[in-house]
From Swiss-Prot:
GO terms for biological process: actin filament organization; cell morphogenesis; cell motility; cell-substrate adhesion; cellular response to nutrient; chemotaxis; mitotic cytokinesis; phagocytosis. Its main location: membrane. This is Serine/threonine-protein kinase phg2. Residues 81-193 are annotated as: Binding to PI(4,5)P2. Residues 55-68, 1077-1087 have a biased composition (Basic and acidic residues). It catalyses: L-seryl-[protein] + ATP = O-phospho-L-seryl-[protein] + ADP + H(+); L-threonyl-[protein] + ATP = O-phospho-L-threonyl-[protein] + ADP + H(+). Residues 778-788 have a biased composition (Acidic residues). Its EC number is 2.7.11.1. The lineage of its organism: Eukaryota, Amoebozoa, Evosea, Eumycetozoa, Dictyostelia. Residues 21-54, 221-238, 246-336, 350-379, 501-517, 762-777, 1098-1142, 1197-1223 have a biased composition (Low complexity). Serine/threonine kinase regulating cell substrate adhesion, phagocytosis, motility, chemotaxis, and actin cytoskeleton organization. It is a downstream component of Rap1-regulated adhesion, and it is a regulator of myosin II phosphorylation. It is also a negative regulator of development initiation. Pfam families: PK_Tyr_Ser-Thr (PF07714). The gene is phg2.
């Protein structure tokens, strides 16, 4: 074994692990990593949850009332890393002044008002913070915020409810009225820091008797005077930086002992059994000038605060002090706005008293009394109010109990206490005050004390000694019994002084009734004794305090605070409620607000309306209040919401009852009454002409104030102006027009066809242009002597400006309340020109005009109307946009001849949705806000395009105010807008649902029905009430496919979040379009097919014109320069003429056109007509060019003159000798009809039997009857229904009877050439006679055309039949009739 060597070990690498084991190891490692990651995420979530809990805890603490412990030295001791948010606080007196504050979650409204108190223009003024939100009808609503509210919570709550952020507004406390406006010079130094804001200062003394001791320290200065006769007003203006304690300038807390010995003993130091006798005999007669007569409403916040009373109870030493200050403060409650000097006779005898002691906010009492007129500044905030559970009399601010009900017993004129359930003392309920509306004298308002004689002083001293003997007994009795005994003693004393007056003790109920029924009489008949008055005053000021800082608010009722039904402190018994309500007469039914003038933010009157109060009574009250002449006002009921932004008002009759008128409306809260002063007629109606002659003389009544706002060169500043001055001349860039612009120059006539802006090269049309201008002058209704235009030439610096010389106005195609729409030309392209005149424009309309131009200039889509620019002229703004000849979708749907099938429905709805999707896809999204069928135009190629972007707004914070306004037609407006929410993209989806419903209803039933047609609606506002409150929607047809019905229902869902967006709608429409293409028969089966209608005849109106138009036509190629053509010389006989052997009734202004064949010289046809005839037909919706309907095989040639537009028949040899040099001979194999766009001219079909003018066909084979009509927006568009006076003449009637009835305004020409020749020969055998004078026959209605005529007449009806513009000289009648198409049912 020894020879064996040990085994040698070699460091060899371990063998590799199998692959499956390696995979398991890797998986395990991954699992461990995932577990670690999950643990780390859980820790992070826990930390975040803890942070959220801490943040929520801070928010909850911030929502509660903040105490003074949260603030040390005025500096917030919270965490510096607390997130802060920026808030903008606006100053209500100046819209351009605001402060931006960084606030955290703990900051409250009280912090904001305190922080901005010294930063307002009038530093030191009491201010309140208000929340301004959007109310109904676009009005603002302000609500005063409580000091405890957290600013973060206010904003977050509104955001959580999907509402807009409020606007925080800081307002100055409104000042109050006073009797005297003079100030006493000796009291100016005693002015309270809060008195300038109109704070009601409390005239009453210590609220809870002697239980509450107000000590003075650095924060509270109580002025005491020992062993002195201070007849002056002792000042103790105690101003707390955080509590804002307001003491009167003449402190009523001076403890007076005027020989009455009315001791209110405070047993505060119970530990040492020492009674701190504070003889607070506040002998304040309350001789104030605050419009208070024994019943003042001013509340002294210092005397009602008990937050510092704990200092006397925490003292370890027993201190017995008796404060007997003989300060007869006869004017102790004088408001600094009006002082009354105390009378010399009011000074009472001085009595000795112990040194006054004050109790500071510390365990030890201050031994240094303050001087009488010292106001100690506050450098640090006082400690928070403390609670002492050992003493019931020491309670915090929020724990004060209401006073006893019978604390004001035996008082002649006591103010109603809170315990009795009556209204707290208020300035609006002061008997005899101005606010109360009484006409009492000054003596009724200010109750002076009677003079104090020596005998009375001796009696007072005797009574004082008797009272001192009863001190020990009174200390053992309850507080209320002591006060009752004191009042009884005072009553006996007062009866001894005035034995002739017998005062009976009154119960609290009787006292309250007596005061409510005759408060002024009591003050006149029985003057109160000083001590009695002081105690009643102290009891009347006893009410709970509110607010986070313990500040006593004004006793005037706040319009933002809710009324306490149960009274100030307790609920009150049934008898108390009856007593409280007995002040209102039984015949008063309701309080209603009547606004005066047009502005809702101005003056209004709240009137107690009775059952029989009429509008005449209201007018009389307002006239008497405002000193207006009798009968110069009227009352109207106003509905403020309308689609065009205007308001609807109904003037009430004098005998109409106000309550009945208010209750007749379904929702009375949506209406309000308005009292309007009747405007007198202007004295000088020719004022505008005077200003044009003497522009430097501007009467004061025509001046519009600019308030020193200077005009700047920048055009953007011009849009920001609140008002545009009328007569302010500002030079702008020079215009390219041939003549210069001036503010006084009136614009040319824009209503008809202002051809002064463009010139024709053809001289043959000069006279026609003048005739058109003269005939269309009646369309312009804007010219008046009183029109005052303002200068907008400074707006020409705008980027979209188009010179007026580049625009050509053709005719007016529409008009509205504030604008007119013309058809015109711009750069050889037909455009629509929307104009706004200065006399109708307001600042909002100008801003809307600019907004629409800005939006149109930024969008580029074939599904939206194209924008070319804007034209700025004197007193006129024009917008140049794309011209759509077919008109609006609303008009197309109302056309009964249109075959509105599913193909059109899918095509137009898809295009509309794509256009809306384009707006919504912009960044930021753009909301149209006024989607309806009237704002969807159909172009000449039958494409739907959106228009009217005046109400369109971007969804940004700058447009929050306008997005909340109720705009658009009510039937298309989403119901949530009525409820105060903002417009968003889902609001447009709601409008799309209504538009699809209209189109489906028209497609299925064949008849257009307006939304909500089944409801009797007299005003548009009722629609929005139906949709929002009653959840009513238009009724969908039963035959509607289920997919479309579901889509429409989703679009107008009540919840905006459940509505689909435009992408979803478009996807659904494309899916349904595929289903329709696959099964058209099934879709067409649900449609109600109307009877097939074909055009059988065309009737024209009979004309009785007696106009002699002498038109001198300049013809360069012919010698017919002086042709006196007397057209339409009708003298009473009816004759018939023939043209090409065709009977033409003379009773109609019919024009027959022999259509030439198409040849290489067809361009001459356009030249032969007016410049604006054939060349303008290219944009006509009637026909692409000249429509020719071949109906016959008649042979013949026709010569068409290039310049004279004469038609010659080659069959007549007498007509081929005058104008052959420049005439082009064309072969005319058929005879046809040229369909014109002018509805006032006739269309006559000539040809074989039967003659039917068929509408043209589209490439897909469908027939569009609407191609025959013009879908512009004319002022007098004819009706599409046939007139009852038009008859249809069949071929049998012509053949059998052999005549044409020419009295029915009907024309039908049927039959072949032979038949027509027979008829023609029977009526006129002299057809081949050469007549050089056209229509020079003594016949009425002789508008027939002889084919032998060689006369050159510019005003011939042949020319006017093919012109775009009709010639008034050819067709003119005193009683014109519309031209209609007669349709016959062929079933």
């Amino acid at each position: 074994m020894d020879d064996q060597q040990p085994l040698q070990t070699y460091n060899q690498p371990p063998p590799p692990l199998p692959k499956h084991i390696q995979l398991q190891i890797q998986q395990r490692q991954l699992q461990l990593q995932q577990q670690e990651e999950q643990e780390r995420l859980q820790q992070q979530q826990q930390q975040q949850q803890q942070q959220q809990d801490q943040q929520q805890h801070k928010l909850e603490e911030g929502s509660r009332r903040r105490s003074l412990s949260d603030v040390v030295g005025g500096v917030n001791i919270s965490n510096k890393e607390t997130p802060k948010r920026a808030f903008r606080i606006y100053w209500a007196n100046d819209n351009h002044m605001y402060w931006t504050l960084l606030l955290d979650s703990t900051n409250t409204v009280g912090d904001v008002s305190e922080g901005l108190k010294d930063k307002v223009p009038s530093s030191g003024t009491q201010c309140y913070l208000y929340k301004r939100t959007k109310a109904n009808f676009g009005r603002w609503k302000d609500r005063r915020l409580s000091n405890e509210d957290s600013v973060w919570d206010i904003v977050d709550r509104r955001r959580k409810n999907h509402k807009s952020d409020p606007i925080f507004v800081l307002k100055r406390k409104k000042s109050t009225f006073s009797i005297s406006q003079k100030k006493s010079p000796q009291n100016e130094s005693d002015t309270s820091p809060l008195s300038s804001s109109g704070e009601f200062l409390n005239p009453y003394t210590n609220p809870t008797g002697s239980n509450n001791i107000v000590p003075s320290n650095a924060g509270h200065s109580r002025n005491t005077s020992s062993n002195s006769n201070n007849s002056a007003n002792t000042s103790s203006n105690n101003l707390l930086a955080h509590h804002q304690f307001n003491n009167n300038n003449n402190n009523n807390n001076n403890n007076n002992n005027n020989n009455n010995n009315n001791n209110n003993n405070n047993n505060n130091n119970n530990n040492n059994n020492n009674n701190n006798n504070n003889n607070n005999n506040n002998n304040n007669s309350n001789n104030s000038s605050n419009s208070n007569s024994n019943n003042s409403s001013n509340t002294t916040t210092t005397t009602t605060t008990t937050t510092t009373t704990t200092t006397t109870s925490t003292s370890t030493n027993s201190i017995n002090t008796s404060n007997n200050n003989n300060n007869n403060n006869s004017g102790s409650n004088i408001n600094p706005s009006s002082f009354i000097s105390p009378m010399s006779s009011l000074v009472s005898l001085s009595l000795s008293s112990s040194p006054a002691s004050s109790a500071p906010h510390s365990p030890t009492l201050s031994s240094q009394p303050s001087s009488p007129h010292t106001i100690t500044p506050i450098t640090t905030s006082p400690p928070p109010p403390q609670r002492n559970n050992s003493s019931k009399s020491l309670k915090s601010t929020m724990e004060m109990e209401p006073p006893a009900e019978y604390i004001s017993l035996l008082s002649n004129n006591p103010p109603p206490t809170n315990g009795s359930g009556s209204r707290p003392p208020s300035g609006s309920f002061i008997p005899g005050s101005i606010v109360n509306g009484s006409r009492s004298s000054a003596s009724d308002l200010i109750g002076f004390k009677p003079p104090v004689c020596q005998q009375q002083q001796q009696q007072q001293q005797q009574q004082q000694q008797q009272q001192q003997q009863q001190v020990q007994q009174q200390q053992q009795q309850p507080q209320q019994v002591q006060q009752l005994q004191q009042l009884q003693q005072l009553q006996q004393q007062y009866q001894q002084q005035q034995p002739q007056q017998q005062i009976q003790p009154l119960s609290p109920q009787q006292q309250s009734q007596q005061q409510q029924q005759s408060p002024v009489k009591q003050s006149e008949s029985i003057p109160q004794s000083p001590n009695l008055q002081s105690i009643t005053q102290s009891s009347s000021s006893n009410k709970p305090l509110s607010g986070s800082t313990g500040m006593n608010r004004s006793s005037s009722p706040s319009p933002f605070a809710k009324k306490n039904i149960g009274g100030g402190g307790g609920g009150g018994s049934l008898a108390d409620r009856k007593n409280r309500l007995s002040v209102q007469p039984k015949d008063i039914m309701r309080l209603m607000r009547f606004y005066f003038g047009d502005s809702l933010d101005g003056t209004f009157f709240t009137i107690a309306v009775q059952n029989d109060t009429s509008a005449k009574d209201v007018c009389a009250s307002v006239e008497q209040k405002l000193l207006l002449p009798s009968g110069s006002t009227f009352v109207s009921l106003v509905l403020p919401i309308q689609p065009n932004g205007s308001k609807i008002e109904r003037v009430l009759g004098e005998d109409e009852i106000i309550i009945e008128v208010k209750d007749t409306w379904e929702d009375p809260s949506q209406t309000f009454f308005q009292v309007t002063h009747k405007q007198q007629a202007p004295n000088n109606k020719r004022l505008s002409r005077q200003i044009q002659a003497e522009p430097h003389v501007i009467p004061s009544e025509w001046r519009r104030s600019t308030d020193a706002i200077s005009l700047r060169a920048s055009s953007d500043d011009m849009w920001k102006r609140k008002s545009i001055p009328i007569f302010l001349q500002v030079t702008g860039p020079p215009n390219t027009h041939s003549h210069s612009h001036s503010p006084q120059r009136q614009l040319p006539n824009m209503s008809g066809s202002p051809h002064s802006h463009h010139h024709h090269q053809n001289n043959n049309n000069n006279n026609n242009n003048n005739n058109n201008n003269n005939n269309n002058n009646d369309l312009d209704d804007d010219d008046s002597d009183d029109e005052s235009d303002f200068d907008v030439s400074t707006l020409r610096g705008w980027v979209h400006w188009i010179p007026s010389a580049d625009l050509e106005y053709i005719k007016r195609i529409g008009s509205g309340t504030y604008s007119k729409v013309y058809k015109g030309k711009y750069r050889d392209k037909f455009v629509a020109i929307k104009t706004m005149r200065g006399s109708n424009m307001t600042t909002e309309q100008i801003e809307s005009f600019k907004k629409e131009c800005d939006i149109l200039s930024t969008i580029q889509s074939p599904l939206l109307i194209s924008f070319y620019g804007s034209c700025i002229e004197e007193s006129q703004l024009s917008m140049v946009v794309e011209y759509c000849s077919k008109g609006t979708l609303h008009k197309v749907l109302n056309n009964p001849l249109l075959d509105f099938d599913w193909d059109k429905w899918f095509k137009w709805m898809t295009e509309v949705v794509e256009g809306v999707r384009y707006l919504h896809s912009m960044n930021p999204p753009m909301v149209h806000r006024d989607l309806k069928t009237l704002n969807i135009l159909i172009s000449s190629d039958w494409t739907a395009k959106l228009c009217d972007f005046g109400l369109t707004r971007t969804m940004t914070m700058t447009n929050v105010s306008t997005l909340g306004m109720l705009r658009g037609t009510m039937a298309y407006t989403a119901p949530e807008i009525y409820d105060g929410l903002l417009f968003n993209t889902k609001s447009d989806v709601y409008s799309l649902g209504v538009i699809m419903w209209e189109a489906i209803q028209r497609c299925i039933s064949g008849v257009y029905l307006r939304p909500f047609h089944e409801h009797p609606i007299s005003m548009d506002i009722q629609i929005i009430i139906l949709t929002s409150k009653n959840k009513v929607r238009p009724k969908i047809s039963e035959n509607c496919p289920e997919q479309l019905k579901t889509l429409i229902t989703r679009c107008w869902d009540e919840n905006p979040d459940k509505r689909p967006n435009c992408d979803e709608i478009l996807e659904i429409l494309l899916t349904m379009k595929q289903a329709h293409d696959e099964n058209k028969d099934e879709w067409e089966s649900i449609r109600t097919k109307l009877p097939k209608q074909t055009i059988k005849a065309v009737s024209s109106s009979s004309s009785n014109n007696n106009n002699n138009n002498n038109n001198n036509n300049n013809n360069n190629n012919n010698n017919n320069n002086n042709n006196n053509n007397n057209n339409n010389n009708n003298n009473g006989t009816n004759t018939n003429s023939t043209v090409n052997n065709v009977v033409v009734p003379s009773s109609s202004n019919a024009t027959i056109v022999v259509a030439p064949s198409v040849s290489s010289n067809s361009s001459n046809i356009n030249t032969s007509m007016d410049n604006k005839s054939m060349s303008s037909l290219s944009d006509s919706p009637v026909l692409p060019s000249v429509g020719i309907v071949s109906t016959s095989s008649l042979t013949g040639n026709s010569n068409i003159n290039n310049n004279n537009n004469n038609i010659h028949d080659n069959n007549n040899p007498n007509n081929n000798n005058s104008n052959n040099s420049n005439n082009t001979s064309l072969d005319v194999p058929p005879v046809g009809v040229i369909l014109t766009r002018d509805r006032r001219n006739s269309i006559i079909a000539v040809g074989e039997v039967p003659v039917i003018v068929k509408p043209p066909e589209t490439p897909d084979g469908t027939t569009m009857v609407t191609e025959v009509f013009d879908f512009e927006v004319p002022q007098d568009s004819p009706s599409l229904e046939p007139l009852s006076s038009n008859n249809i003449i069949s071929t049998a009637n012509i053949l059998n009877i052999g005549y044409v009835n020419n009295e029915n305004n009907s024309i039908i020409i049927e039959g072949n050439k032979s038949t027509l020749n027979e008829i023609g020969n029977n009526n006129n055998n002299n057809n081949n006679n050469n007549n050089n004078n056209n229509n020079n026959n003594n016949s009425s209605n002789n508008n027939s055309i002889n084919n032998n005529s060689s006369n050159n007449d510019e005003n011939n009806c042949i020319n006017n039949c093919i012109n775009i513009e009709s010639n008034e000289s050819c067709i003119k009648s005193n009683t014109p009739e519309q031209i209609t198409l007669k349709c016959v049912d062929e079933r």
